[in-house]
């Protein structure tokens, strides 16, 4: 009711517990590494046409994990709520009855521990036309986006890397403009875009499973 948190009561509860801390604090870590290459070529065709084209390459790796930072008066923590979901066929360590009840301390990983990877390759082009009061353009692009993950908690080393899934995307756009005078113009643009889904929606649960949507 007061908007405060009774840490002393939590510490007393954890200290009295014979099965480890009931409440702890962990930090969510999300470390991102990006690399990219964008190269563009431009040229003219005659006096009225301008052409632009290029490639767009991108690579992403994201480390996602939760690490215990405070046991709040307890001596250890048991992450049974998450470890009970680790399947033996994915991680052989789960065959040990003690796996679910392993005593964890500050610095140990809970809940999630995986790397997410994204690789994208694309090409694009645009042709523009300009003559007097009239201008027009048409453009398009194609891309291939690949997603995969590497999990260190729910999967052992033999199964840690998921299969890659590739999504082909593309777009096409066009438009025309006519300047009626110095202050007024009329124009029309249209386009269609098909892009890859977000990384998280490629997996049923990207936090703990290689299983895919679709």
Where on the chain are the PLM-derived regions?
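Surface-exposed loop/turn segments flanking beta-strands in extracellular/periplasmic regions
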Residues: 2-16, 65-109, 158, 206-214
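Residue-identity detector for threonine
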Residues: 2-4, 18-19, 33, 39-43, ...
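Structural signature of Gram-negative outer-membrane beta-barrels, strongest in the C-terminal barrel
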Residues: 50, 56-58, 104-214
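Alpha-helix-centered segments that form part of catalytic cores
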Residues: 14-33, 99-122
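Short N-terminal secondary-structure initiator segments
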Residues: 23, 31-41, 81-100, 195, ...
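Outer-membrane beta-barrel domain signature, strongest for Gram-negative TonB-dependent receptors
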Residues: 1-66
């Amino acid at each position: 009711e007061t908007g405060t948190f009774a840490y002393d009561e939590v510490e007393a509860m954890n200290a009295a517990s014979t099965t480890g801390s009931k409440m702890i604090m962990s930090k969510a870590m999300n470390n991102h590494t990006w690399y990219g290459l964008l190269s563009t070529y431009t040229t003219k065709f005659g006096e009225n046409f301008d052409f632009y084209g290029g490639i767009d390459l991108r690579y992403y790796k994201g480390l996602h994990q939760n690490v215990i930072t405070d046991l709040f008066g307890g001596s250890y923590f048991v992450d049974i709520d998450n470890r009970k979901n680790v399947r033996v066929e994915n991680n052989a360590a789960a065959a040990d009855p003690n796996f679910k009840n392993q005593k964890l301390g500050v610095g140990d990983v809970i809940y999630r521990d995986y790397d997410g990877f994204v690789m994208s390759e694309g090409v694009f082009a645009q042709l523009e036309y300009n003559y007097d009061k009239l201008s027009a353009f048409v453009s398009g692009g194609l891309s291939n986006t690949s997603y995969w993950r590497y999990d260190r908690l729910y999967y052992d080393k033999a199964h840690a890397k998921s299969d890659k899934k590739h999504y082909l995307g593309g777009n096409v756009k066009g438009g025309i403009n006519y300047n009626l005078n110095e202050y007024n113009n009329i124009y029309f643009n249209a386009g269609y875009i098909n892009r890859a889904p977000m990384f998280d929606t490629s997996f049923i649960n990207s936090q703990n499973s290689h299983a895919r949507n679709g």
